[in-house]
Amino acid sequence: MSSILGLNDKQMEACSYTEGPLLILAGAGSGKTRVITHRIAYLIDEKSVNPYNILAITFTNKAANEMRERVDKIVGEGAEYVWVSTFHSMCVRILRRFYDRIGGDTHFTIYDTDDQKAVVKEVLKTLNLDPKQYSEKMCIKEISSAKEEFLHPDDLAARAGTSYREANIANIYREYEKRMRQNNALDFDDLIFQTLELFGKCPDVLHAYQERFHYIMVDEYQDTNHSQFLLVRYLAGGQKNLCVVGDDDQSIYKFRGANIYNILNFEQEYPDAKVVKLEQNYRSTSTILNAANAVISNNKGRKQKKLWTENEEGNSIIFNEYQDEYHEAEGVVDQLIQNHRNGVPFADMAILYRTNNQSRVLEEKLVMNNVAYKMVGGTNFYQRKEIRDLVCYLKCISNPSDEVSFTRIINVPRRGIGATTINKIRDEAAMQGC
């Protein structure tokens, strides 16, 4: 039982329940990641499960890497055979092997948002639609929402009914998909969408993965959308040893398509499911937890849980209201300066803000008061122009059908090739059926 030593009673219960559906309601700071990694170790060490037969799905590459490292430390040899992945990474691996079974090319390119905008821009020209009424950002969001609901263009058209705008969105979606196929490209939503298509049309492929994954764990289940729900249901349809971990109280991604009812209705989807609540918090003071419990208890339709801790009471919570963002920034910076005068190094202080546009006023106040600061975040490495250009060259080498990448780098470095020449090349390619 060394795999679960040091865990509290509820954590041990969650780790040792291995057969059948399991919902772990993990409150904030309750040791969720620790439970998942120790549960994997328990399956391998105590239940003699082959690591090859275990799948753990997380939402970010960072979380996946952290989980791999933790499992490796606990299990040691053999841990590398556990499939720890994000939804999208898992689907890429599956499609690289089997996408040709449903008419795709396994050497597809994955388009990011900027690539999608380039495709939508051409689609709007083709359909003679006003970009002011149908912005690239809006079109991408509508297409993404449709794919997250596992809706094809025809499904969207049928749903549109007599709505002129919705009918145009369906046409944009249809033309977008046509161009994506011509470019041998998939967007991030396609990775899950096409995997669902593959499993639906090729039951032998689905069966192979169901036979491989005897034990499936899904982290942050409250953040899953409908297509991710369908994917999990497909994979768990064989052995039915599905463990999902999440907290409906932490569901904040509805604007990204997350469906909170995936976790709220888990017991309806799996009537024989066991539920384990992790309510002991290791991160916060009791003052913070009492305030959080008081606020979240007003939510309707939530799964009841009450976080508690053995930690100290801690300082009182200070809540300040300001007239506007300028007074707020002034109040925040004044407090930082006061803390510094009381002996707290600036390096030990941080300002958290909800949206990027809030930083401007805060930065102005910091500069005015000669407070040195460092911004955490900024432009992602792969979003830098020179990196994107280089990646597009590599994409063209790997996938000659990738028109978006070709258009981006045809004049990088400058070769005197203008829009007229590019349009002639594009027209000639269309005539040649390229």
Segments predicted by a language model, with ranges:
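Conserved helicase NTPase motor core
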Residues: 5-16, 20-24, 55-56, 63-64, ...
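Helicase P-loop NTPase motor core
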Residues: 28-36, 271-274, 279-372, 395-400
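ATP-hydrolysis module of ASCE/P-loop NTPase motor domains
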Residues: 79-82, 100-190, 213, 275-277, ...
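P-loop NTPase Walker
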Residues: 1-106, 110, 117, 183, ...
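Proline-centered turn/helix-capping motifs that create local helix->coil transitions or kinks
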Residues: 147-153, 239, 295-305, 430-434
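ATPase/helicase motor core of nucleic-acid motors
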Residues: 90, 125, 269-270, 312-316, ...
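Short glycine-/polar-rich loops that comprise or flank the Walker A/P-loop
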Residues: 20, 49-53, 78-81, 238-241, ...
